[in-house]
Amino acid sequence: MTTDAAAHEPSAGTSRRDVLLKVAADLFLRNSYDGVTVDMICTAAGISGPGLYNHFENKLALLVAVVESPLAALHQFARETAEAEPDPRTALEILVDFHIRSVIGAAPTTLIFMKNEHALPEKDRRRIRREMNLYAEEWISIVSILRPDLSEPEVRLLTHTVFSMLNSVATLNKGLDHDSIIKTMSTAAIKALTSPSGE
């Protein structure tokens, strides 16, 4: 077994499917869909080639799951947080923290989607973009309350800019520990989203 495969051996509570999703996400982000083969994915996951088809119909189905599964989790968390937390500032802090931890823990969904969008059928692209927009709307609704000085287009621009900043952690991290990353990026994101214009 290769070193990479050993690193992705399923631990307690981790299924083969989860391992395939993780290694495929890393590979799709690094090489894009066209540069990744089923053999590459299975070797990195430490399973035989046919093993992938026990969990996914094909490589394309795996790509769709790589993007949709974490995106659905982000959207659900954002929706539940917005519903459960009455204070918008606290809700925003929770969303920022969760998003950063998600980016640190796995290849960011948005970057994977952007790099591999060309490989997806139109119906899948539309569905994924709709889910991304719904996730963003949860943030925009909260930021709009906290930033009455901004117009709706300005809030949208600001929110998506902060998303780009947070997602960049996956590719720009230069060896900082997780706590330092979370603290630095959370502070920057909250300040950007809540500071009145001119400050």
Map each language-model feature to its residues.
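N-terminal intrinsically disordered/low-complexity leader segments
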Residues: 1-15, 22, 79, 197-199
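Helix-turn-helix
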Residues: 2, 19, 23-61
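Generic hydrophobic, amphipathic alpha-helix propensity
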Residues: 16-24, 41, 66-70, 74, ...
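Short, structured motif recognition centered on aromatic/hydrophobic residues
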Residues: 28, 74-75, 92-96, 112-114, ...
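Hydrophobic alpha-helical connector segments
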Residues: 65, 80-105
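Amphipathic alpha-helical packing segments from all-alpha helical-bundle domains
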Residues: 72-75, 122-147, 156-160, 187
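Amphipathic C-terminal alpha-helical segment
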Residues: 102-105, 152-153, 159-179, 190-199
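Amphipathic alpha-helical segments used for helix-helix packing
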Residues: 103-123, 171
